[in-house]
């Protein structure tokens, strides 16, 4: 009688420790939900957010070597936007979500409107090329962000179908 009870206890212990998992087929194992992964795209996104975008603002700040109140406020608004973007990306990556929700993108777009308004004021009738260069770099950066978001998903979708 005691041997039968010991065999039952040993079988229960084997189930709890996972010793019988080698006999399971993958057909009986539940599929894991797809999750975003930390990759080189995340590192490049952070590098762009923390290096290229502030560099564009620096070009505007050095434009004509004038430190006006409007230029300083615009630079501060731009750096605040970059800081908010970094915080939101870090929070959403920690929660395992996509980098920015539509509401967060709209809020960051409103912060970026101050920079666009400064571009219209500081062009000096087209005599300086620095604001145009900064605008081109910012536009290229936005296109790269969009492509870095869309292309991996399009590639994964084409493989899945």
Swiss-Prot record:
Keyword Kinase: no
Name under which the protein is recorded: Protein UL20
Family statement: Belongs to the alphaherpesvirinae UL20 family.
Main function: Plays an essential role in egress of virus particles from the nucleus, cytoplasmic envelopment and virus-induced cell fusion. Forms a functional protein complex with gK and this interaction is absolutely essential for their coordinate intracellular transport, gK glycosylation, expression on host cell surface, and function. Together, they modulate gB-mediated virus-induced cell fusion and virion egress and therefore actively participate in these processes.
Keyword line: Host cell membrane, Host endosome, Host Golgi apparatus, Host membrane, Host nucleus, Membrane, Transmembrane, Transmembrane helix, Virion
Pfam families xrefs: Herpes_UL20 (PF04544)
Cell location: Virion; Host cell membrane; Host endosome membrane; Host Golgi apparatus membrane
């Amino acid at each position: 009688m005691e041997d039968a009870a010991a065999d039952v206890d040993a079988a229960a212990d084997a189930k709890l420790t996972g010793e019988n998992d080698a006999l399971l087929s993958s057909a009986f194992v539940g599929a894991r939900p797809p999750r975003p992964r930390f990759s080189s795209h995340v590192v490049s996104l952070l590098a762009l957010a923390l290096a290229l975008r502030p560099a564009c603002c620096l070009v505007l700040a050095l434009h004509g070597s004038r430190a006006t109140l409007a230029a300083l406020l615009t630079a501060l608004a731009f750096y605040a936007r970059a800081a908010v973007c970094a915080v939101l990306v870090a929070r959403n990556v920690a929660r395992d979500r996509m980098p920015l929700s539509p509401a967060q993108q709209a809020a960051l777009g409103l912060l970026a409107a101050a920079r666009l308004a400064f571009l219209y004021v500081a062009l000096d009738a087209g005599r300086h090329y620095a604001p145009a260069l900064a605008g081109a770099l910012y536009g290229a950066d936005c296109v790269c962000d969009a492509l870095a978001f869309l292309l991996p998903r399009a590639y994964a979708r084409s493989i899945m179908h």
